[in-house]
């Protein structure tokens, strides 16, 4: 099964479906922005205490519908309809979705939120696409891109963290970076 999935994605899947996946995150972003520009987010609280808005729900519906059309045989796990039962019956290959990553930032109107979709196989990401609804920027990549990375070309490292939920681990990591003179 793994070899079939890799061959399918390597030879055809990403190229064949990339435009559909880009359209998917663009549509989800448009749905999010419609709510973002309004005065009403329809905010609720999930069972874990985190916020949920109409934008999360709309984006999730758009993405779920699109992924079912793009790849009906590949399961979808989304933050908005996640359950432990999903994990028990999960295939080796599945889509992992966060339809609105940064809901607190969305609510606080910081413009710092994204739409995230990854294709996972054997617990490894083999394709991912991220959209920033406010800017309209979209990034994507796969293990098959064969892009070379020149480590010597990196002049400056930027660390990005959530403003709304920094943890002790985050603080410890920043202290570690500071201790090795990375600012």
Task: State each model region's role.
Residues 1-2:
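Intrinsic-disorder-associated, low-complexity terminal segments enriched in Asp/Asn/His/Tyr and depleted
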Residues 5-100, 167-179:
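N-terminal subdomain of lithium-sensitive/metallo-dependent phosphomonoesterases centered on the IMPase/IPPase/PAP
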Residues 32, 56, 67, 103, ...:
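Residue-level signal for inorganic ion chemistry
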Residues 88-144:
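DPxDG-like acidic metal-binding loop motif
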Residues 131-159, 165:
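ATP-dependent small-molecule kinase catalytic core of the GHMP/sugar-kinase superfamily
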Residues 152-183:
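An extended, acidic
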